[in-house]
Each structure stands twice: as structure tokens, then as C-alpha cells.
Amino acid sequence: GEPLLNPEIGDYITAIHKIFPYTRIIIVTNGLLLLSIKAPLIQIIKEDRVHISISDYTCLDRDKIITFVQEHSLSAELREGKECFSKYLNPQGNSDEKEIFPQCIRRNCTFLAKGKMAACCQPFVAHFFNEYFHETLPENEGIDLYESGLDGWEIQKRLITPMRTCRYCSKDVSFDWATSKMPYSKDDWCVK
């Protein structure tokens, strides 16, 4: 989801920077809320050297965003619009996670949600797919950040280890990007 919707994003940034002081933190945003972030969050972003990656959607006022970024001396980029989309889900759950994980382009985009961390978004967004398509992909898998004795080394080890969720992914299959219209099709998400 959109990270700037999270009222505790500043706390997350501070905690991650404290645990992993040399890790590059990137906020990937659609840009719609960027101009409304308040001074305390801007200060945290600057102090912890957070980079902001902004989707360059046509509805955004590029000039205002560029001015905002420059006025606040933020590290940011405007990413080009989408030309293709990839489907990768395998609802049968019969993929070999040890084969899929090393090829996964999402495995290096660490996500935080509800006190958990995972190498990708899938454990935290599967419920949307499950609800709409009446499927049972695993939900809420991830590293419990409140686990007793958990340290940065253990987190790092688990982030590079395939999850059970990986069995429900496949190799990416790209297709031309277009706005989806209801009713949505499983074929837009599933390879098998």
C-alpha cells in the first residue's frame, strides 16, 4: 500500500535506521500525498537519508513535486510511467520456493506491516486477492518484529530465506499495462 498513508511511518524509519544504520531506506510512493507531509516527517527523512521514489503518474503536478523536493533538499526521483505489468501468482502453491526465490524481482523490496517484516509484499497483500477471488493464499507470514531475542542478524538471515508464501509464486510473465476494470480477472495475476 501507499506508505505515506501510515501515520507511524516516521517511527518505522527511525527504528529501521537504528537497527540497520547502513541500509538505504527507500519510500516508494504514488506521490499523491507527498506535498502534504509535515515538517517532523521531512526532518526524519532527511536525518536518516531516506530516498523517495515517486511514480510519475499523469495526474501529478510534476513542477510542484520538483519544487517541494528541492525546497526541502530531499533525495528523490520521479519514475517513468508503467508500460508493462507482470503476473506471477500460482494459486495451486506447488512451485519450488528454492527455485522461485532467487529469481524473484520482489524479494529485495522489504515490506513492513502489522509488526512484521518480509522480503516482499506478498504475505501482506494476499488477503486482497483471497477476498476477491475466494482463494486461500497464505497471509501474514513474515518476521514478527516483537519476537523475543530477535536481532538484526537473524532478520537479515530470514530475509534471504524463501518463505512458504514463495510456493504460491511463479516466474514473472509480462504483459502490456492498462487500467483494470471490474470485474477483475484472475488471469491478470495468475500464471498457472
Regions found by a protein language model. Name each.
Residues 1-102:
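Conserved glycine-rich "GG(E/T)P / GGGxP" loop and the immediately following alpha-helix
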Residues 70-81, 122-176:
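C-terminal accessory region of radical SAM enzymes
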